[in-house]
Each structure stands twice: as C-alpha cells, then as structure tokens.
C-alpha cells in the first residue's frame, strides 16, 4: 500500500491515507499511455472537413469544345481538376477518426498515469476545498497556499461553487472522479485528489 499525507486547504497535515498499490504503484509503459492519449484526441476530432471533387462541383456537364479540329487540348468538362474552378483530387472528406481501445487497456493506462504522478511526488490529497463564497480570489488564495501551478483537481461530486471560482484561473481544471482520464492527468503537472474522490477512483479501477 502507498501511504500519502492528507492536508487541509491551509496545507496543514490532517492524517494519512492508504492508496492501493495496484492502482498507484503500477509500472509505467509509455507506449500504452501514448495509445490511449492518441485514441482520446482522435475521438475529439470533428472530422467534418470536406472539399468538392469533380462530381460535387456544379456545372461541367457540357463538353467545352469538340474533340478534334480546334488545335486545342481535348477537354471533356470544365470542372476537371486541371481547370480553374474544377474539383479537388483526393481531398479530405468527412470521416470518423476514433478507434477502439480495449477497456482493460484504458483502465491500465489510467492506473499508469496515476502511478506516474505518485512516483513524481506530484500527487496531493486534500481533505476538502471549501470557499466562503464564489470568488476567484478565494480560490487563488487556496491555490497559492497549496502551491498549485498547473493542477488537475479531482472531486467526488460536482461543486458549482468551486467550479465558478476557478474557471478564470489559467492552468487549473476541475473534474469529478468519473470523468478522470489519462490525457488530463498527463497534461497537468500536479494531480490534486479530494479525499472523498480517492475511494471512488479505487472502486472504479478495481
């Protein structure tokens, strides 16, 4: 079991918590992390890019001039890719970029990402973050005390107060435990787990 110190929002030690070694002390395999991140980013692509081929461009039905006798190069359509205003050859068409990654691989990658932050000592467990009111300055004050610079905060439940207070702060993101993903863990240098989210994460990855 991995033992981590639990702090309050004043960065005072409040206790210890045991983290499952099967989740937070997994050997990291970069190729698996790369695969899952690539799948995540591919799934986010809209894939709506499109150009018109010669079959899509309007017009071009009539032969511009007769086949022989003019001295000009033969032409069958003024929408040929060779012509100005003609169609595009092999241009991008709408497509789905997503590809399947097995559930076991996705879960393993999430464990590896968590283990990576734990091994780097960039995993912080906070008992809770409670602000007196919805104000950015209150969150910034807590972030400065905790030394958060580029941090992903994981909460057990959605907190509108916390979300609204931190949305104008750059390089900080709030997620609930069920939306935790490999890309965001690797994108943000610090991983801050609210104590209530830890057991939910372990139950999800068990």
Curated annotation (Swiss-Prot):
A Pfam family reported for this protein in Swiss-Prot or TrEMBL: Ribosomal_L4
GO terms, molecular function: rRNA binding; structural constituent of ribosome
Top-level taxon of the source organism: Bacteria
UniProt keyword list: Ribonucleoprotein, Ribosomal protein, RNA-binding, rRNA-binding
Residues covered by region (Disordered): 48-78
BP term (GO), one: translation
One GO CC term on file: ribonucleoprotein complex
HAMAP family: Ribosomal_uL4_B
Function (record text): One of the primary rRNA binding proteins, this protein initially binds near the 5'-end of the 23S rRNA. It is important during the early stages of 50S assembly. It makes multiple contacts with different domains of the 23S rRNA in the assembled 50S subunit and ribosome.
Subunit annotation: Part of the 50S ribosomal subunit.
Similarity annotation: Belongs to the universal ribosomal protein uL4 family.
NCBIfam families found in the cross-reference section: rplD_bact
Protein name: Large ribosomal subunit protein uL4
Lineage: Bacteria, Pseudomonadati, Thermodesulfobacteriota, Desulfovibrionia, Desulfovibrionales
């Amino acid at each position: 079991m991995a033992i981590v110190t639990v702090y309050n929002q004043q960065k005072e030690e409040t206790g210890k918590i045991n983290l499952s070694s099967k989740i937070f002390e997994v050997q990291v395999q970069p190729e698996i992390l790369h695969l899952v991140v690539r799948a995540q980013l591919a799934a986010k692509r809209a894939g709506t890019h499109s150009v018109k081929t010669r079959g899509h461009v309007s017009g071009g039905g009539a032969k511009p001039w007769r086949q022989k006798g003019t001295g000009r190069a033969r032409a069958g359509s003024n929408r040929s890719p060779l012509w100005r205003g003609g169609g595009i050859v092999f241009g991008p068409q709408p497509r789905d970029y997503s590809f399947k990654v097995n559930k076991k691989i996705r879960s393993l990658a999430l464990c590896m990402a968590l283990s990576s932050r734990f091994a780097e000592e960039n995993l912080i467990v906070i008992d809770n973050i409670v602000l007196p009111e919805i104000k950015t300055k209150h969150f910034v004050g807590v972030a400065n005390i905790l030394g958060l610079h580029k941090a992903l905060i994981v909460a057990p439940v959605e907190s509108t107060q916390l979300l609204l207070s931190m949305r104008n702060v750059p390089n900080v993101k709030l997620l609930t435990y069920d939306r935790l993903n490999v890309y965001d863990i690797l994108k943000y240098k610090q991983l801050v787990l609210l104590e209530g989210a830890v057991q939910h994460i372990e139950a999800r990855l068990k």
